[in-house]
Amino acid sequence: MQLTPNKFTLKQLFSSSNEQFVVPGYQRRYAWGKKQQKALFDDIDLLKEDDNHLFGMILCHTGAHTGGLNQSEVVDGQQRLTTIALLLLAMRNKFKAIEMNKKVEEIEGLIHCTDREENILQKITLGELDNPDYKRIFEDSTEEEVVNLNLLNGYHFFSDRLNEFEKEELLSFYNKLINVAVIIRLDASFARDAYKLFESINNRGLRLSPTDLIKNFILGHASKIDQNTLDQVKELWSSVIINLDRIDTNQFLRQYMCMVLGKRVTMDKLVEIFKHYYVNNVKDTDLISSAELYTEEVEFKDEEDENGYTNSEDEDQDELEASEDIAIKTKISIVEFLKGVKEASLIYKKIRLREFDEPKINQKLLNLQRILSFPSYIFLLSLFQREISMKDKLSVLRLIEVLMLRRHICQKRTGELDDIFSQLVSVEDENIVNLVKDRLKEDLPSDEEFEDYFPHHIFKGKLIDRARYVLEQIEYYLINDKGEYRLSSAKEVHLEHIIPQVISTKKAQKEFGDWVTYLGNNAVIKHKKYVSRIGNLTLLSGELNIKASNNPFNCKKDNYKKSNLKLNSSLANHYRQFKFQQVEERGYELTKIASKIWRF
C-alpha cells in the first residue's frame, strides 16, 4: 500500500497551480449545515496566531504527476473541503468589497488552477449534482437558481460573520485560516488502497452512513478487478445518487434489500446483510478480504422517515441468515448487479416523486403518501418492475390503500408492515390481484374493528393530510364519482374544523365567537376529546373558510350551504345545532360510508 501523509496549511494545500481537487459524482451532495459551518468558523476565529489547529483530514486518490492538469479524486473529506472553499469565496468577496485587491488576487490564486492550455479552472469541482450550484456561487451569479441551499446558506453564513469584523480582525482571521490552521492530506496511488483506508479511517471518527459504507465496499471490490470495471461502477453508482437526489438513500437501500430478500431488514443490520448477500451473488468476491466483510457493531440511529416510521422493532429475527439463504443460481458481475440497483433506484424515485407516465398511478401513490404508507414501497419496488397490466397495478395499489388506511385507523403495529410487504414480494404475476388480496386479508382489520375505531380516530399533526384524503374519498362516494372528478388542491380547499380548534382564549372568542358558552358544561375538557375527530371535520374552500371561521355555527351553516360539496350541504341541512353530541352522530354516519369505501 503506497501512502503519502502530509501536513499542510491551506495556502500550501492549494499552492499547486496545476492541481485540481475533484469530488466524484458517486459522492453524496454537500450536506453540512449551519452547525458544522459555525464550528469550523469558530475554531479558526478562536485560534491565536501561534496556535495549531487541525482542520481534519482529506483522503485523495492521485494518479501519476504530469506537466498538465493533475486531478486528485477526493475519496474522503469532501464536506470539509467544500466548506473551506465556501469560506474562501466569502473572504474573496469581502476583500473585494473593501477594495483590498492584493488579498483578492491571493485568494483567486488559491481557488483557481490552470490546465496545459492555461485555461483558468476551479481548484475544487463538486459532483454532477452540486457543481452547477457551486459554480453559481463561485462566479457570484444568479442565486435564485441554486438548488442545494446548504451551499448557498453556508456561503451567506460566512459572509455575515465576516461582515462583523473590523479590518484588522478580518486580516487576522484570514491569516489564521490560510497560514496557521493545518489539514492532513493522505494520498493513495491506487484506488483499492484509497477505498480500503476510507472505512478504517472513518471507523475512528464520525460514523459513516450505511450508504457510505456500502458505496465504499462496492468501489473497493471494483478497484480490485480492473480499471474498466471501476470506471463503470463509479458511473453506475453516480447514476444511483442522481436518481435519489433529495431522497433518503439509506432507506432506499434498506427497502431494496427487504424486496430482494423477501424479509424485513433493519437499518442496524443493513450493511452486514448487504455484504453477505453481495458475496453470495456477485462474481469475483474471492478478491474481498474477510476484514472487509466484517462490519463493526454500530447502532445506527433509527430516524423517523417523513411518514413517522422507524424500523427498530422485532430485533430477534435472524436477518443475516436470510441474506445467505437468498442466492441466485449463477453469480452475476458487479456491473450487472449495479445495473439492477440503478434500475431499482429509478423506480424508487418515480414512486417517491410520483413520476410515472400514467396519471392514475400517480394519484394512487399520492393517496398512499397521504395515508402514510412508507413500508409499502418495499413491495411497490417489485410491483413496478413486473410486466403486468395497468389495470392490475391500479387494483393492487387500491388493495394496499385499503389495508393501510384500516390498519392506521385501528392502530395496528407499524413494525409489522415491513414483514407484510417484504413477504408480499413472492406473489406470482399470474392472478396477482387475487393473490395479493388473499395475502393482505390476513392482516386486514375487520369491519367491526374498523367501525369501532374510525369515529374516534384523532386526525391532527402529521395526520391532517390523512383527514383530507378520507374526506375527499367520502365526497367522491357521495357524488358517485367514477374517477373523473378531482377536488382542488389543499391551497384552495382546506380542512375545516366545524367546532374551531381553539375556543377558550380571548383571541379565539373574539375571532370565532363564544363557543365555550355555546357548547355548554365542561366545554374546554370535552373540546380536546372531540375537536380532531372525523365528525368535526369537513372540507371548505379558502374563501369560505375565512368567512366561516369568524361565525358561530348558525352563521357557518350559511356558508356551508354555498359550498358545492355534498359533505357540506348535508351538514348544513341536517344539523340545527352542532355540539359534541352532533360530532358523535356525524362521526357514526361517516363511519358507515367509510366502511363501504375501504373494503376489499
Residue ranges and their predicted role:
Residues 198, 381, 397, 401, ...:
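Generic hydrophobic alpha-helical scaffold/packing signal
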Residues 2-284, 550-599:
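Glycine- and hydrophobic-rich flexible loops that cap the catalytic core of alpha/beta enzyme folds
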Residues 211-214, 221-475, 597-599:
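A cross-family structural signal marking well-folded subdomains
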Residues 42-70, 426-568:
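Betabetaalpha-Me/HNH-type nuclease active-site subdomain
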Residues 72-80, 175-178, 186-193, 210, ...:
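Secondary-structure capping and boundary motifs in well-ordered enzyme cores
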Residues 11-18, 51-68, 167-175, 344-358, ...:
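Active-site-adjacent bridging/hinge elements
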Residues 94-98, 205, 224, 385-393, ...:
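Short helix-capping/linker segments at secondary-structure and domain boundaries
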Residues 41, 85-88, 198, 377-384, ...:
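Short, amphipathic alpha-helical segments that act as regulatory/interfacial helices
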